Amino acid sequence: MKIGIFDSGVGGLTILKELIRKNKYHEYIYIGDTKNLTYGNSTIENLKKYSDTIINYFIKKRCDLVIIACGTISSNLSNYLKEKHKIKIIDIITPTIDYIVNKNYKNIGLIATNMTIQSNKIASSLTKHNINVITNPAPKLVDLIEKNLMNKKENIKILKEYLAPFQNKNLDLLILGCTHYPIIKKQISSLIKTQLYDMAYPISSLIEDGAILKVQLYFTKLNNDILKNVINILNCKYKIEELKL
């Protein structure tokens, strides 16, 4: 099976990493739209344009399935994209909601991009099931992660401020509502003693096992920070190129 995966940058690689870890060996085409970072601080119209262009590319490449490995796109445009494009599309928000509802959690935290929080998709879906949801946006994190700057003292301070609303709230779970955030899971865990939820967890259950792994990575703007991030995230053979869309 040929699977297209896309995100605004390297964050979606956390989804790909989990799929490979669970032996979902397929042909993967990954697009990180780094030219248009960050999606979480963009507009709906721009996000539609970026997503449509990428999905049309996947269709041109004869992909069988597309995974939206971006919380911002999944929470704001998943219905639009599924209705518009004649290809199977999986978003990462729906499986997250289903997982949490089935676990009977009662008190959840959500840290995500501005646009994911503003969409209210996760919070409204969970509150319908009598789950209390505390939300807080973290608008600077994606850019800092992309630039490999999250080990600097001043940026750990920013992260600490983003996590402050979740402290001492007796949370069952803190949702990492952006696929970039698992990249800094170690730093987050050092600042808050709450179980962390990675949106990659339930995706693998939606994909059948495969036998042959092939990974092609494309970034719409390629630089050394991206190359470093890819090396740190993925533990498999891959080809990587810059892609003009």
Where are these regions (language model features)?
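Non-catalytic structural scaffold of enzyme domains
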Residues: 1-245
